[in-house]
């Protein structure tokens, strides 16, 4: 009887040990970045370049550091809203009052974006777009 109870104890203790061997993996959130709805980055630059109206900019707004160069670069920072529109614009390396910046904001505001999501919920994401303004003809 003693041998039988020891044998049963060993069998049942091994079964409970097997039940504890479950693998628990941490859940990683699914994050999707915002992107231009009109295609890839090249398509975005093509759109900005073709829709940037140099009639809306002033020659005196060309930065002094770029006077003898054929172009200058500045950056437009913005967020993508829940409905895929660009908003909350801010300039980098240029004044917010500069006509080149204002024209770039006008063009970027006319674009549509696929929104950023985290676990299929809207996530506000900021984008930085470099703008190369060709000033060789001014």
What are these regions (language model features)?
Residues 12-16:
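N-terminal signal peptide c-region/cleavage motif recognized by signal peptidases
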Residues 5-6, 17-138:
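Charge-biased low-complexity segments
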Residues 2-10:
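Hydrophobic helical h-region of N-terminal Sec-dependent signal peptides
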């Amino acid at each position: 009887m003693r041998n039988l109870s020891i044998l049963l104890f060993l069998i049942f203790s091994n079964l409970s040990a097997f039940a504890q061997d479950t693998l628990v993996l941490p859940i990683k959130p699914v994050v999707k970045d915002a992107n231009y709805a009109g295609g890839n980055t090249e398509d975005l630059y093509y759109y900005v370049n073709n829709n940037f109206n140099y009639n809306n900019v002033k020659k005196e707004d060309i930065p002094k550091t770029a006077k003898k160069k054929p172009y200058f670069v500045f950056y437009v920072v913005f967020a993508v809203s829940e409905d895929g529109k660009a908003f909350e614009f801010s300039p980098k390396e240029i004044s917010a009052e500069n006509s080149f910046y204002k024209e770039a904001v006008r063009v970027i505001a006319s674009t549509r974006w696929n929104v950023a999501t985290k676990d299929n919920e809207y996530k506000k994401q900021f984008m930085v777009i470099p703008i190369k303004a060709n000033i060789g003809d001014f």
